[in-house]
Structure formats: structure tokens, C-alpha cells
Amino acid sequence: MDDLASAAKGQVAQRDGQAGFNDAGWQIVAGNYERFVTQIDAEATSKGLWRVNGPLTAASHPYDRFARSFDHATGKVAMHFDVHDDLLRSHVGPVRLSVTYLDRGTGTFALRYDAAGDSEKTAFTVTKTETNAWKTESIDVTDWAFQNQGPRGADLQLVSLDAEDDIFHGVEVVKQPAEAMPAP
């Protein structure tokens, strides 16, 4: 908290007149920033992080402010996500799945999704290379089902494949035009 006085004044006062950054406040919507992709039981399955790379400065990456991570010490080794049922009404065409993560350490994680015939299909596996940069991994998939058949009723899962506490900024789902997929 950089400006305690502004934090007690509410959202508009914080936006218009605070000095520095406040990562908490009063009368602020609880939970993750989300739209159509909701983390299932976020507090029980992951750890919230703030100011990931230290104090925020003009040189800080925008993703440094808020993130979520695995926490092996407390058994939080998989995050589960529900894609809102009305987001993708037509099950035709490709969907791009993207994960933004901090490339810190050399650990490995996977993104899994609810596919036709496989509710825990691996979309991709990432092995980090210790650049300490924010990176985004994406893949277009055509066999997605998103029928809430994964663990905890999930459509998407981030799963730790080792003992590192991987750090994530976001998960994104974007419907692609049919021509976005390369020909077989």
C-alpha cells in the first residue's frame, strides 16, 4: 500500500487522486480480474501475488502488479477454469488458448483442456528457461468441447509437473476464424 489515505476513500478517489499504487482497498470487487473465464475456487487452488518483481516503478512490467502461482507447500498444484457457457455457443472452428507466465526457474507446467473424447487433453507443456521475462504460450485447438468435464467441473487446467511454484498472469480463450488454422 503506497497511499493508505486514498485506500479508505473508495475506488473513484483512488483512481483520481492517489499517490502510488494500492493493491487493496475498500468497496472493491473481490476475486480475479476476469471476463468469461473464471478460476474455480481460486483461494483453495492457488496463491495470489502482488508486486511480483519487487516495488513498482516506471520500468516495471504491467504484469508485475498482480499474479497467481502454484504453492506446493500447501498442496496448490493445479488451477481450474470454467469458460462461460455462452462465450462459445457454436462448437465450430478453432479456439486459441493462451497462458501468460513468468519465465522464472526451469520448471514445467501444462495447460489441459476439455476436448471431445478427452476431458484432460494436454494443449501444451512449457519448460521455463529462466529469462525472468513475462511470456505467452498459445495454441489453436479444434477439438475443444468445454462441457465442464474436467476436474472440479473445469474446461481448462494449469497443472504443475514438478516442484516449482510457477507464476501466471492470465489465461485467455479467443474464438478464431475458420481460416486461422493451417491446412493439414
Annotated model-derived regions:
Residues 107-120:
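Short, surface-exposed beta-strand/strand-loop-strand elements in extracellular ectodomains
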Residues 2-88, 117, 172-174, 184:
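Glycan-recognition and processing domains
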Residues 86, 100-105, 144:
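Solvent-exposed strand-to-loop "edge" motifs in beta-rich extracellular domains
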Residues 138-171:
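Extracellular beta-strand ligand-recognition surfaces/modules
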Residues 82, 98-100, 112, 140, ...:
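Residue-level recognition of well-ordered beta-strand positions that form the cores
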Residues 77-79, 95, 105-110, 164-169:
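Short beta-strand/loop motifs in extracellular/secreted proteins, especially
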Residues 118-150:
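Extracellular carbohydrate recognition and processing domains
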Residues 88-98:
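Extended extracellular/luminal ectodomain segments enriched in beta-structured repeat modules
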